[in-house]
Amino acid sequence: MGQKVHPNGMRLGIIKKWNSVWFANTKDFADHLDSDYKVRQFLMKTLEKASISRIIIERPAKSIRVTIYTARPGIVIGKKGEDVEKLRISIAKITGVPVQINISEVRKPELDAKLVSDSITSQLERRVMFRRAMKRSVQNAMRQGAKGIKVEVSGRLGGAEIARREWYREGRVPLHTLRANIDYSISEAHTTYGVIGVKVWIFKGEILGGMETVERLDKPSVQTKKQYRKNRK
């Protein structure tokens, strides 16, 4: 029986970048890794309603730089940047080093697998029919320019006694093509019947030229709190 490899892990260093960008000695590596995990867990819990896509952590010269990709930058930044400052102080306590926080806006949340899977799980928890939630997400992604999308849900669908899985796909999703830019995410919906797993694959097109092309295209619209306030005015 064939198994599917993780689409993001398979493409790391080819067309995908790491979420933690730092190098450490053997004695410091475990501490840095544990620190990164705690920072991510803290941010995902604190910013649960801010539609967080991913968190990039860099460690330049005894400090830490955290870039938060979100569909709702206003919620993260808060009034006059108050919330960002609270986050900075909390992360500094966790890591024990000076912290810089950057906010990057996700322009098209319909094409972000993490945000799509979170959207479907929230609908399932609100008792929306799973087929309707899947179809709506697929149609929104295709409307925004996705080359293909596949959504799979598994568990006690509709409260059935026997767990099963169903999937819905539009367009093409070439999992074996390494140059294919496929965004993948998994989420869990906690319903009264039990846990329902949601997997999302989104094919955005092919990237030719490897990591050089990715570096050139993936320069984020990172905003400090001052820039955000200036742009908002």
From Swiss-Prot:
Domain KH type-2 as annotated: residue spans: 39-107
Subunit structure as annotated in this protein's UniProt entry: Part of the 30S ribosomal subunit. Forms a tight complex with proteins S10 and S14.
Native source organism of the sequence: Buchnera aphidicola subsp. Acyrthosiphon pisum (strain APS) (Acyrthosiphon pisum symbiotic bacterium)
PANTHER family, per the entry: 30S/40S RIBOSOMAL PROTEIN S3 (PTHR11760), SMALL RIBOSOMAL SUBUNIT PROTEIN US3C (PTHR11760:SF19)
Gene Ontology terms, MF aspect: mRNA binding; rRNA binding; structural constituent of ribosome
Name by which UniProt lists this protein: Small ribosomal subunit protein uS3
Keywords: Ribonucleoprotein, Ribosomal protein, RNA-binding, rRNA-binding
Pfam family, one: KH_2
